[in-house]
UniProtKB/Swiss-Prot annotation:
Gene3D superfamilies: YggU-like (3.30.1200.10). It comes from the Bacteria. SUPFAM superfamilies: YggU-like (SSF69786). This is UPF0235 protein VIBHAR_03581. HAMAP family: UPF0235. NCBIfam families: DUF167 family protein (TIGR00251), PRK05090.1 (NF003466). Belongs to the UPF0235 family. GO terms for cellular component: cytoplasm. PANTHER family: UPF0235 PROTEIN C15ORF40 (PTHR13420:SF7). It comes from Vibrio campbellii (strain ATCC BAA-1116).
């Protein structure tokens, strides 16, 4: 099991490194002991967090309210909990 992604009961917990202002939204892959995700939103006024939440909700096929930022609200390093995901993206399945 990876340090970047693990199961906690029915939930999935992700340790992320976020790259804001990227050319497109993408799960890049492992970045040290974290999962790197590139997002197009700038890191201003919570826009990157809102965009990240929406992107992850779409990837895991859950409502945005089921994606929680547990740590790192104001930084690039974050810990995210996804409650009872319907699907696990292929890029993440490969490292679990």
């Amino acid at each position: 099991m990876s340090e970047a992604v693990w199961h906690d009961g029915e939930d999935v917990v992700l340790r992320l490194y976020i790259q804001p202002k990227a050319s497109r939204d993408k799960i890049v892959g492992l970045h040290g002991e974290e999962l790197k995700i590139a997002i197009t939103a700038p890191p201003v006024d919570g826009k990157a967090n809102a965009h990240l939440t929406k992107f992850l909700a779409k990837q895991f096929k859950v409502a945005k309210g089921l994606v929680h930022i547990e740590k790192g609200e104001l930084g690039r390093h974050k810990q995210i909990r996804i409650e009872s995901p319907v699907q696990i993206p292929t890029e993440i399945k490969a490292i679990i």
